[in-house]
Amino acid sequence: MAVGAEPKAAVRETVKRNIMTLQPVDVTWRFAGLQEYFRKLMPFFLKNLRHDKIFLSAGSLAFQTLLSIVPFLAVTLSVLRIFSFFASLNRYLEEFIFQNFIPSAGEDLRIHFEAFIGKTSTVPLIGGLLLFIIALSLISTIDRTLNDIWKVRAPRKPIQAFTLYWTVLTLGPVLIGSSLGASSYVWYTVFTEGPLLELKIRLISFLPFVNSLLSFLLLYMLVPNRRVKLPHAFSGAVAAALLFELSKKWFVFYVSRFATFEHIYGAISAVPLLFFWIYIGWLVVLTGAELVFSIGNVLSSSVEPVPKRLLPGLTQLFSVLGTIWRAQQDGSPVHIGTRVVRGALSATAADRIVDLLLQKGVVHETSGGELVVSADLYQMTLFDLYGLIPWELAVHEDLEGYDDDGSETFASLEKDVTVCLKETMAVPVALLLQDSTNQCI
């Protein structure tokens, strides 16, 4: 036994020595990969900011919010008034909104808000229904804008969207009211004396940041019609919350030191002042959303471009459709939340192709969230499939600014190519899929 133990000990020493030798290399490799990741993140992030035109989107959202904020708050508070338990919390909810989301310089705005919201309680039934529709339209616009950032081309189904918006308008105030009720009880019964009172004072200073952080986190996790990883959403929420707190301090400094709005607009300065603050808020929200999207997609976007092909986009479209079709044939359809294709095709590109297939009615989503082929692939030819590819999916990014000045010159040539392609590709898609399946077997 002693003789056999010596070789084992020697082997262990050799393995240990090799591992110790490899550790610095592994750490260096990981550090280099992390460095490369952050090197690509910022250009990709800035590119998305320009491409999605967030300054224009923030202005559009700010204008609609300015028109909808009073109806939205009126609907929120009216939902709480339905429940007698929450009736006493309306004041706390107003305090919560103004202390956490509106700068301290907005006391005049608060007075106007209270007057406007007080008048909405006397609105008749039809007027109340109109307020509810306006509030729903604001949520719908927010949903559509954030999904545009995530490149979601297939919108939610009308019933699914209405259910989501209805839940936000009804259960949202109830959850906020319950949270405020529970926190108020603990706040005024537990944190009243001694060290706990000092802790209470410290917690108050962090409360606005924590509230902003949780709001952004839920927004980035739940609104996009895509699976967003928690670390990515949390990173973007932290950045957005920090930007939001800095924006509040800058806004207070600007309003208190430079009374530009009062000099220009006089008595009605509260309106442009509110619009300016809402615009800054939406700019922060969209910037955080772009950061969350960039963190999750920067690696897939940095994949080396494939060589230009005669039929750009068709191979990828055929691959995604084939994956969905084979999974359906095997009796285990692909779920909408899972990655459809693995390999060189990035998750973002695959999601865009799935959205395209959903829009064109080639596939549809079942009530269980599964992707199923809708079209008759024995009638659909390869040319029909090729015709579904939009221009932005077919071209490379370096051709985004390409301007076809010779469209008239190449009109006849394009017609000849189309006829040739139509004749050559007059092959049922199902036959090709069956052939590729047999080759895989």
From Swiss-Prot:
Keywords: Cell inner membrane, Cell membrane, Membrane, Transmembrane, Transmembrane helix. One of its GO terms (cellular component) is plasma membrane. It is found in: Cell inner membrane. Its main location: membrane. Disulfide bonds: none annotated. It is a multi-pass membrane protein. The chain crosses the membrane at residues 54-74, 122-142, 161-181, 203-223, 233-253, 266-286. InterPro entries: UPF0761_bac, Virul_fac_BrkB. Belongs to the UPF0761 family. This is UPF0761 membrane protein Clim_1521. It comes from Chlorobium limicola (strain DSM 245 / NBRC 103803 / 6330).
